[in-house]
Amino acid sequence: MISHRLHKIVLIICVICGSALAQQQPDLEFDTSVEKPAYKKDSPRIMFDEAHHNFHTTEGRYKPFVDLVMNDGYRVIRNRQSLSKTRLSGFKILVISNALGAEDMDDEGADTSAFNDDEIQAVQDWVKGGGSLLLIADHAPFGGAAAALAKSFGVQMRNGYAFDKENSVAGAPSQLIFSRENKLLGSHPITEGRSENERIHILRSFTGQALKGPDDSIALLKLSQSATDSPHFDAALSASVAGFAQALALKFGKGRVVVQGEAAMLSAQVSGQENRRMGMNVPGNDNRQYVLNVMHWLSGILK
């Protein structure tokens, strides 16, 4: 009896540990140093939102992103209050990554708007007056939670899962490849950088959604003619999203907006017992430089 109980206890512990190891964690070994910081003084202030059940936080899965931009000369302040005109005052950039309408992504209401009407109006007015927004919303349910805020800037979020068997990692059709070779990188200061060293050649995403921007927006990551969208990761039904994007940039009043339909590509994470890498830490892509270029454009040093 004791032996049987002990076996059950060990089994439970193994399951718990395996589950914990399988979770996404920040890659704390990823090199976030910047040889030549963009800002050595007068650091732009970034508000990083943590007030809306965000899946990504400054000390959690997005720590590598935060460390990288801080090493580039920015000052990052986390926000745990409702967004308002007063709260946004004094900040140059607002970063929102994977907000939710409920505490957990599996909870009922997770895909409902994470932002109330007053917050959406405050952010819209702030951007119109010269602020810059980086809005990141992954596959379902994150797209649903950010859809109302995105819509206020003319951006449609599909809130599904984007696939492209012809332009993706072999055996992983949701991990999309955007390169100069496959012509899925848009022409924009973000993809060109300030010099040849900053020029983007290839980017990789890690399962996201499709976006449709207003006519004056620029698709940074274009979805090809073979791209499709499904409401669930394993859904049998899918629809074409040819002409959509997985990231786009636009100017709004005096401000600027970048909307990302995939989040992991802007951080560096590990998952599973084998510590599989996901994001900037995966070799063979320019995701790290892309993060820097996005922030350079939002802060204004890229015109």
PLM regions with names:
Residues M1-R5:
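N-terminal secretory signal peptides that target proteins for export/translocation
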Residues L6-I9, Q25:
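Compositionally biased, intrinsically disordered low-complexity segments enriched
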Residues K8-S19:
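Bacterial N-terminal signal peptides
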Residues A22-K303:
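Short, surface-exposed patches at the edges or C-terminal ends of soluble domains, predominantly
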